[in-house]
Amino acid sequence: MTKQAPPTTVLPLSEEQLDRLQTATGDLSPLQLAWISGYFWGRVAEGKPAVPPPSQSAAAAAPITLISASQTGNARRLAEQLRDDLIAARLDVVLINAGDYKFKQIAQEKLLLIITSTQGEGDPPEEAVALYKYLFSKKAPALPSTQFAVFGLGDSSYEHFAKTGKDFDSRLAELGAQRLHDRVDADVDYQAQAETWRAAIVEQLKSRVAVASPAQQQLAASGNVNEVDSSPYTKEAPLTAHLALSQKITSRQSLKDVRHLEIDLTDSGLRYQPGDALGVWYENDPALICELLALLWLKGKGDEPVPVAGQTLPLAEALQKHYELTQNTPAIVAGYAAFARDEALLAVVADKAQLQQFALATPIVDMVRRAPIELSAEQLLSLLRPLTPRLYSIASSQAEVGEEVHITVGVVRYEIDGRPRTGGASGYLADRLGEDDELRVFIEHNDNFRLPGDPNTPVIMIGPGTGIAPFRAFLQQREADGAPGQNWLFFGNPHFTDDFLYQVEWQRYVKERLLTKISLAWSRDQAEKIYVQDRVREQGAEVWRWIQQGAHIYVCGDANRMARDVEQALVAVVAEYGCMDPEQADEYLSELRIERRYQRDVY
């Protein structure tokens, strides 16, 4: 008979259960013990069994595995198109998001396709970080039986263009896998390359894969993949909405111009969740277009008809609505230098590092101003890239605001040789769009930045500057749900008096005890600069206690500096208070990421 603990004890285990637990955990490292503690707490909080049942896809793996690693949705849409192509060719395929892929099964893959974007300065998209780290670790297996192909999406205005695709391609080859097709590195205008690549992949696989049975085809097409939420409006077919409110939420003295925008979605049926982003199709500044045309001896030719996306438009309208004018790239600099034959520009092009820095710091119009020449409309358009929408983290919950969507916009303002310049999208939203004006928008769903399913789960939110936006949505949702879980916000900006975004709302949440803790970092209010990562370290013991209680951690904001510094702070906290070395702490954080307890929305 099992001996039960006395009724007065607080121990919820019998002596026999306790003995079994001690036996099972006696040889575990501090990292393993800490992970198990948080793992089972999270399972209890979510109301899920400790060991999930095997998935249907795992039980009957398809010959073709297609992994989508997306940051802004482009890679996911392209992967869905390829999935549909393969199904139409009666080939058996499983499409899976990188964040859901059980990467330790990669050695069993025979045919592997990866479509991936790159974020920031060459980093993998958030949902692919765990897979990326695994493949580049000592644990990665040899892959002699795997054939693969990689399509990499990127933005050539960044130095490490399409780096994640390049990294996946080279690493898979190093591990012994064989290329089905040469890697493709595609810029923002990737559609033509993608169509060619998709067709080539399908043709190659037809000779390698048996035709799928009707049941297999139905399984592949029935949504046994992680589809994004359906929406009546898309990037390609956006909603025409109206601006309801535009309000500056920094003070007159602030060096930052941050706007709170409310957009009316009445009768549109457009739905979103906290964690999603709003895509905005902006228009270029007419004054900037006039300046550029004048420098290129095209003044007075704004009405000249030009072909754009299957239609004919006046040149000025084409530049306003269809071409990127505010972000320069090394390719544009090189192309213009070849037209201009300017010695100074050609010298810049000859130096790769100097070229990258010049493109980053010099808008197109200011490059032209350095060496103005006469160009035809055709030559000008041949240099430019298509305009792409900007994404903004949504700052509202529909449970609170109904048929509206709110965003927080940091307006980009600077000077070049004394001439004021603004960001393309932020300037459009702040300066050229009036209340009740129309704008084209769509929802970019982000299943990799979601509140816990269990309202009892505590959350830690780290978002300096405009990175605070999604956490406004989070707390609106938690309030509407009556969620009892604790909430802790880390926020930072230069000055308390000038830059405390949504201050009154946070104060109300603190007063009403919805916001359990708030830790603030004002970088310019004292001699020593203080940032959110410093507050995380200062509160390390409490942060670790929350993590041990199953807290989910969310980070939003700048990918290149803040997010890296915050991650280093979290690793330091885990190492110190979890009694681990830095490598173990980093692995522990990776496990949290896999469990969806550490999520980032960085840009």
From Swiss-Prot:
Residues 64-202 form the Flavodoxin-like domain. NADP(+) binds at S523, R524, K529, I530, Y531, V532, Q533, D565. Keywords: Amino-acid biosynthesis, Cysteine biosynthesis, Electron transport, FAD, Flavoprotein, FMN, NADP, Oxidoreductase, Transport. FAD binds at residues 326, 360, 390-393, 408-410, 414, 423-426, 603. It catalyses: hydrogen sulfide + 3 NADP(+) + 3 H2O = sulfite + 3 NADPH + 4 H(+). Residues 236-452 form the FAD-binding FR-type domain. It comes from the Bacteria. Pathway: Sulfur metabolism; hydrogen sulfide biosynthesis; hydrogen sulfide from sulfite (NADPH route): step 1/1. This is Sulfite reductase [NADPH] flavoprotein alpha-component. It comes from Sodalis glossinidius (strain morsitans). The gene is cysJ.
